[in-house]
């Protein structure tokens, strides 16, 4: 039998050391990658529970294995909570990722060779929305919409393309778009041409749950999301849908794409959904947006251009060309100062995808630590200081010291 005293630190010190180093990195660095956040201790406790031992192919009340009476309770809690959180008619909480959630929608509604329409990856979309190297781009005929001269979604062009190509599925959602999306307008054109309307709200889910970003659920046939990012849950996916699509979506997940669901992760999702229904969570999301607004303002004052000219969410893109820096260079520079960002292509980017002319900045993780507008302003100035002096190691060291003071004052876990 197992001995509860045989901890990871005791049985696998090499792995334990790597985990402790990552824990230290998360504490000592300011995380500004928009798709990352910190989960609560309760979410981590759920994920580290005995539920990881249980196999449960199927759905609550309809399992292919015995002994599922308690994991049925866990999954039903997750389903009921996420439906209430977003006002959905039906929900599937089993997808292991946002990408698999998207794949399930494709499996439910499409055949290879069908036409889909999504936002261009080069202008802010996601690779699962039709990128050539992704299965969505390999299996389907892809029509991409993009941005207008104001770097806002070109709704008129999107509608024109939809009428011309009549895609079977229209996707709204993005991985690098800072503004509000008019889901109702997408829904109208989808209805006009008889297309299924899908929304990938992975980046905006937490803001939507808090009522601070338009909710796509009333307008879309199906909505997918990750459960981390702004939602602050475990790594995983969900699908929300009209009741009429529940059978097709559920069959696409199991047995279509997955076998036994990760019950320990579903428990973490249930915990996160409960947390997201609180007043504290709404206040947190309000601060996420306030911090992003302050950072944009300061960076513009320091000579940097914000793509689309502003943010209306948790994320924004910074054009680095005025500083004669690439995104790759800026990511490395800021990383040395213990500020973590990711290089990101900007619209009509002349650089290669692994180099880029921009960086993406998101405020969810820093806000989880407790940063307010005061710290957001200071942090934006520190970022600009590094970008203004890319060859001055003294500046990097000074900024690193200021970051150390901030991270010590605002620990990830108190």
Curated annotation (Swiss-Prot):
Homodimer. Its cofactor is pyridoxal 5'-phosphate. It comes from Thiobacillus denitrificans (strain ATCC 25259 / T1). Pathway: One-carbon metabolism; tetrahydrofolate interconversion; Amino-acid biosynthesis; glycine biosynthesis; glycine from L-serine: step 1/1. Keywords: Amino-acid biosynthesis, Cytoplasm, One-carbon metabolism, Pyridoxal phosphate, Transferase. The modification N6-(pyridoxal phosphate)lysine is found at residue 229. One of its GO terms (cellular component) is cytosol. Its EC number is 2.1.2.1. The keyword ATP-binding does not apply. GO terms for molecular function: glycine hydroxymethyltransferase activity; pyridoxal phosphate binding. It catalyses: (6R)-5,10-methylene-5,6,7,8-tetrahydrofolate + glycine + H2O = (6S)-5,6,7,8-tetrahydrofolate + L-serine. It is found in: Cytoplasm. Catalyzes the reversible interconversion of serine and glycine with tetrahydrofolate (THF) serving as the one-carbon carrier. This reaction serves as the major source of one-carbon groups required for the biosynthesis of purines, thymidylate, methionine, and other important biomolecules. Also exhibits THF-independent aldolase activity toward beta-hydroxyamino acids, producing glycine and aldehydes, via a retro-aldol mechanism. The record marks 228 as: Plays an important role in substrate specificity. Belongs to the SHMT family. Coiled coil: none annotated. InterPro entries: PyrdxlP-dep_Trfase, PyrdxlP-dep_Trfase_major, PyrdxlP-dep_Trfase_small, Ser_HO-MeTrfase, Ser_HO-MeTrfase-like, Ser_HO-MeTrfase_PLP_BS, SHMT-like_dom. (6S)-5,6,7,8-tetrahydrofolate binds at residues 121, 125-127. The keyword Acetylation does not apply. This is Serine hydroxymethyltransferase. One of its GO terms (biological process) is tetrahydrofolate interconversion. NCBIfam families: PRK00011.1 (NF000586). Its main location: cytoplasm.
């Amino acid at each position: 039998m197992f001995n509860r005293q045989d901890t990871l630190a005791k049985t696998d010190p090499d792995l334990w050391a790597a985990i402790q180093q990552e824990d230290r990195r998360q504490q000592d660095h300011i995380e500004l990658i928009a798709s990352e956040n910190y989960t609560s201790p309760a979410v981590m406790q759920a994920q580290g529970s005995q539920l990881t031992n249980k196999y449960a192919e199927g759905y609550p009340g309809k399992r292919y294995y015995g002994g599922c009476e308690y994991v049925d309770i866990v999954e039903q809690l997750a389903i009921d909570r996420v439906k209430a959180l977003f006002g959905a008619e039906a929900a599937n909480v089993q997808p292991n990722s946002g990408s698999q959630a998207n794949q399930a929608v494709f499996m439910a509604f499409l055949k290879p060779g069908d036409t889909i329409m999504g936002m261009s990856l080069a202008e802010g979309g996601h690779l699962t929305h039709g990128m050539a190297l992704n299965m969505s781009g390999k299996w389907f005929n892809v029509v991409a919409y993009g941005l207008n001269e104001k770097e806002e979604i070109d709704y008129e062009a999107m509608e024109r393309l939809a009428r011309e190509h009549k895609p079977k599925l229209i996707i709204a959602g993005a991985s690098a778009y800072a503004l509000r999306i008019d889901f109702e307008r997408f829904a109208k054109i989808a209805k006009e041409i008889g297309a299924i309307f899908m929304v990938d709200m992975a980046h905006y889910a937490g803001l939507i749950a808090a009522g601070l970003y338009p909710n796509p659920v009333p307008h879309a046939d199906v909505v997918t999301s990750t459960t981390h990012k702004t939602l602050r849950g475990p790594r995983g996916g969900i699908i929300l849908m009209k009741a009429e699509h529940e059978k097709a979506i559920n069959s696409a997940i199991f047995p279509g794409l997955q076998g036994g669901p990760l019950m320990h992760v579903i428990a973490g999702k249930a915990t996160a959904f409960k947390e997201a229904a609180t007043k504290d969570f709404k206040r947190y999301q309000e601060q996420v947006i306030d911090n992003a607004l302050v950072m944009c303002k300061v960076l513009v004052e320091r000579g940097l251009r914000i793509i689309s000219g502003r943010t209306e969410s948790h994320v924004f893109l910074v054009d680095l060309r005025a500083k004669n820096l690439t995104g790759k260079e800026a990511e490395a520079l800021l990383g040395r100062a213990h500020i973590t960002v990711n290089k990101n292509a900007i619209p009509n980017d002349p650089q290669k995808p692994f180099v880029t002319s921009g960086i993406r900045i998101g405020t969810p993780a820093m806000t989880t630590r407790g940063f307010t507008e005061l710290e957001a302003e200071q942090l934006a100035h520190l970022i600009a200081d590094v970008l203004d002096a890319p060859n001055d190691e003294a500046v990097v060291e000074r900024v690193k010291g200021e970051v150390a003071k901030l991270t010590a004052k605002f620990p990830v876990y108190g």
